Amino acid sequence: MKKYFLAISILIISSLATKAQIGGNAIYSVLSLHPSAKTAALGLDFLPCFSDDITAIINNPSTLRKENHNDIGITYTTLFSGINQASLAYSHTLDKIGSLALGVQYLNYGSFDMTEENGDVVGKFNAADYVFTLSWGKMLDSNVYIGANLKPVVSQYESYNAFALAIDLSASYQSTDRTWAVSLMARNIGKQIKTFASQDFT
């Protein structure tokens, strides 16, 4: 009975979404986008289950395991107003260290008119965000898995750029009969290293 109570309690607690940002005050919203069609279709930030989709796994590194050895994932999405998103991920397993994955996520906001104060168009410029991900996942025992992501983030708008570092920490539990799994995750913990405001806008 205690096992069932514990499992139900974990499910209820893990289903509550907590956010560290208030709408409008967050930066690097590219970190909230879904590189995987699977997570986007389910409306989730990450999948708490084990999958063969490396682009979904990279958002929850504790589900990265040896079964994903040499997996490659590529996604491309066309959004509204000329915005497009692409991602590439690859995983490799090392016996003693665990499973590693490399990922790149690209969000292109399209082309914009460059204007003078009076509104005259003098050219065009582009804006884009890039997220580079190094993932690590390891099985502690047959049911418990842990993982972490290191994510450098680069924003490049016209000739201005900004840089940040973020990490994700996660732990997952999978039932012995493999019928259900839960994950606990802290995402996008980090700091902006270089801001747009630190540059000369004249």
Where does each model-flagged region fall?
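Sec/Tat signal peptide C-region and signal peptidase I cleavage site
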Residues: 16-20
